[in-house]
Amino acid sequence: FENKVPEKQKLFQEDNGIPVHLKG
């Protein structure tokens, strides 16, 4: 899972500047 975090994190951060996986 963590291997995909950096890739998904880049896309999620664009939502509100906050990673969606951290927002829940």
Swiss-Prot record:
InterPro entries: COX7a, Cyt_c_oxidase_su7a_sf. Signal peptide: none annotated. It comes from the Eukaryota. The modification N6-acetyllysine is found at K10. One of its GO terms (molecular function) is oxidoreductase activity. Residues 1-24 are annotated as: Disordered. It is found in: Mitochondrion inner membrane. One of its GO terms (biological process) is mitochondrial electron transport, cytochrome c to oxygen. SUPFAM superfamilies: Mitochondrial cytochrome c oxidase subunit VIIa (SSF81419). Residues 1-13 have a biased composition (Basic and acidic residues). GO terms for cellular component: mitochondrial inner membrane; respiratory chain complex IV. Belongs to the cytochrome c oxidase VIIa family. Component of the cytochrome c oxidase (complex IV, CIV), a multisubunit enzyme composed of 14 subunits. The complex is composed of a catalytic core of 3 subunits MT-CO1, MT-CO2 and MT-CO3, encoded in the mitochondrial DNA, and 11 supernumerary subunits COX4I, COX5A, COX5B, COX6A, COX6B, COX6C, COX7A, COX7B, COX7C, COX8 and NDUFA4, which are encoded in the nuclear genome. This is Cytochrome c oxidase subunit 7A2, mitochondrial. It comes from Ovis aries (Sheep). The gene is COX7A2.
